[in-house]
Structures are given as C-alpha cells and as structure tokens.
C-alpha cells in the first residue's frame, strides 16, 4: 500500500514538473508547461502488474506506448513508470483535456492491441483511477 502510494505520488509530482515529448528534464521556466493543463482536465493513474516470469514480455509490449501516446495530439501528459523494487509493476500517468479524448485514446488500435495481450502477461488486468486536475482558486 505504501509503495503504491509513493509511486502514485511520484508519478503526479514528476508529471507536474515535466511537459516535453522527450526524456525527463526540468521545465525551462516557472510554470510554463502548466498553462497547457486546464482545471478539470481528465487525469488517469493506472497500474498493471506482470505475471511471474512475464515481466520482460510485459515491458516489451508496453514501452512502445510511450512514443505512440505522446504522439497523440489529444494527449497532454503521459508517463510510464516501473517500480524499482518490483520489476513488471507499471504505473501510468496520463492527462487529456476531457474524458472524450481519453476514451478516443483507449479506442486506438495500438491501445486495443496492448489490452488484448494482457490476459497472458498481467495479473488482474489494469487498475484505473480516473481523476481530475485541480488548480488553485482563481485559475
């Protein structure tokens, strides 16, 4: 529980400070990337765990999602993370402007192909928390 909470908190903090399509790096100026994310934007934190012995296979089919999702103009933020202590335990952090954009993303063929492979590779499917981005009062 505590590890999951730490992972989710790390995902949120990391995503909040990085808004480029490349690797992880600090923002160029204070708050520049935040202007792209509106109050109430549709945020998702998802979790998937590999079946024992399937960690490398799940990682191999999941890594290509980074470039594909970040290439979607409707995607505002996408981070894939793996638990350092439990290889094969992945946390996804995604932000879209609204639920319709997220559902359109889920309908993409590459996402559907990924979901179709999960029964052989993942324990219990994907656990998803659907959230909204909050901004300070006045924003």
List each model region and its residues.
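Bacterial N-terminal signal peptides
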Residues: 9-21
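N-terminal targeting signals for Sec/Tat export/insertion, comprising classic cleavable signal peptides
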Residues: 34-60, 64
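Sec/Tat-exported extracytoplasmic proteins
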Residues: 52, 66-73, 106, 118, ...
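Short, well-ordered beta-strand segments in beta-rich or mixed alpha/beta enzyme
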Residues: 41-49, 79-106, 132
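Glycine-rich beta-strand-turn "strand-cap" elements at beta-sheet edges
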Residues: 24-42, 80-86, 115-139
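Short amphipathic alpha-helical segments
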Residues: 54-76, 110-113
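Bacterial N-terminal signal peptides that target proteins for export
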Residues: 1-11
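Short, glycine- and small/hydrophobic-rich beta-strand elements in well-ordered beta-sheets
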Residues: 33, 66-91
